Amino acid sequence: MSEQIGSASNGVMAGTPREVVVYGSAEGFTQEIVIGPHRLVADEPADMGGADEGPTPYDLLLAALGACTSMTVALYARRKSWPLQGVTARLRHSRIHAVDCAECETKEGRIDRIELNIEFAGQLSKEQQLKLLEIAKKCPVHRTLTSEVDIRTRAEWKMHAGSA
């Protein structure tokens, strides 16, 4: 059985990438994020120089992982007709010294650590809970974060009216 999730309900075929556009000014940290019909704001907390008008970029990254994990687990349980009533994912991001991570390949410098704690609600057997924990690690965002990622950054320069 395929472990992939997709939905065509938003007019985008499953697996079709949708462009995310982020608008920001050279002043402050507040960013407007546009994803199809959705509008979000990202910012930094006041103690980091931001206006605290929205979640931080790391908050959004954790939200993406948590939402994907919850959706993946719920979909799997529905397909199996298991009595899962709800999923709560709590996530934290930190940076640790590589030497403090015995299971990590990197042994120098610092590494990013994401702690993901999942709570399953429902009358699930121990075997079902263990299987759902295994499935949680197969969500597409989890796989992306733990795989090799090729980010291709390009730039465009636009002169605005009144610019020199």
Regions from the PLM with identified roles:
Residues T72:
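Metal-dependent nuclease catalytic cores in nucleic-acid-processing enzymes
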Residues M1-A63, L75-A164:
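Extended beta-strand/beta-hairpin segments
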